[in-house]
């Protein structure tokens, strides 16, 4: 009888172990976007050069193009960083009709380096709301440069953030959390991501007041014909966007999935 009980106990343990979800390995300077997927972010917002016909990343996480996005056209030779939804194959598209953007072509698929992609809305939502300690790992903030100027945006911290002396708990006020350039360098080296307030474009019109005050970042998720999900923030964080017309020009921040430590970029 005793042996039978021990055998039943062992079988029960095996069944319980088999039913447990495998734990995802947590990598440094990376971000969970689901229970099974970690990513790292590109070093800056996506840009497109009308002369070279090439995509690239902004030179810093704070860099935005601003009002020059209004020049968008098939013949424009300058750079833009506000894109209609899913325009990876036609970044200079400026139609104001949402249904003209019927098919999502990921900008990441057009990068010279493979593997880049756009987060889905579900992944954005998991990153900001559902991962462990989510409300302590993002918030509106200001990066203060050496001249005293302020770059407003949203900071997002990696899963393994361990700089407890730096307050980055959720805030809906840019000025509550201000980081000088030296502190920001340390945060960035530890994996902090900054999404700048690059503004919003519609056709060839851009509200200048939105540049430096509002951030709108596309997801890959459509809603209905002509509309798609995005994440938006200003002196607020609106991670539960109901969506907007696909014809809006919005920011793009690409990611890469991590499956081994060798894929993680070296800390700068």
Q: In which residue ranges do the predicted regions lie?
A:
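Repetitive helical segments and hydrophobic/amphipathic motifs
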Residues: 11-13
